[in-house]
Amino acid sequence: MTHLRDSGAAAGRRPLALVYRGPASSPGCPEAVAGLLSSGPWNLDVRFTGPDEALPLSAELLSQALLYAQPGGGTLDSAYRRLRRRRRAIRDFVRDGGRYLGFCLGGYLAGATPGFGLLPGDTDQYISSPGATIHEESDTLITVTWRGRPRTVFFQDGPLFVLDEHADATVLATYDNGAPAALVTRFGHGRVAVTGPHPEATTDWYTDHGLPVHHTLDLAMDLVESVMES
C-alpha cells in the first residue's frame, strides 16, 4: 500500500492525523488534542480512531496517516490491555516514518513496562519520584521548565521519562526535580514526541477543577512542531 505520509502532499491531499478516542482515553482529552492539531499551521485532516469510531485503529489505517496521537486517559495497565493488540501496528507505523504524539497516558504508553516501546528508555510516575513536589493523583497545576523558561501547566499524574545513557533525544521540558517532562526522539525513520503534563488543556479543564487558567497552547504547538520535523 502507498503511504499517504510519503505521497499525500504530491497528490494534493491533506496529511491524515489520527487521534485515538475510546475506552483507553478520558472524555475531553481526545477532543483537546484534535482541536490542537486542527488549529495549527500543519493543514492536517484530523480524524478520531477507536473501537466505536468510523475509523477503527488498524495497521491499514495507520499506513495512510502521517501522525497518530494518543491522548490522556485512565491507568496505564488498563489502557495497555485495551491497546496491546495494536502495539506492533503502532511500532511499525512509527518505524516506517510516522509520527507518534503522546500526552500524559499517551506518554506512559510510549514506554516499555508496559507500552509500545517507542522511547530510548522508559517512563515512571512523577508523583512517586524523588524530589517531586506533587504527590497526589488529582487534577492540579505543575511548574516545569520548558526550553529554559518556567511555565505552569495542567497536570494529572503524568509520567517522567527515564532515558538510557547517551540516548538520542531532545528534552523540551523538565520537572522541578530535573527529570524530563517532555521530549522528542526518533524511532526508526519516524519521530516520537511525548509530554507528562497537559499543555493542550483547554480553559474548561482548569475551571472545572477550580484552578487558575494558564494558557499553554504555545507549548503544545512546540511539541507538535518538534514531532513534525523531518
What are these regions (language model features)?
Residues 67-77, 202, 206-207:
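Short, basic, glycine/proline-bearing loop/turn elements
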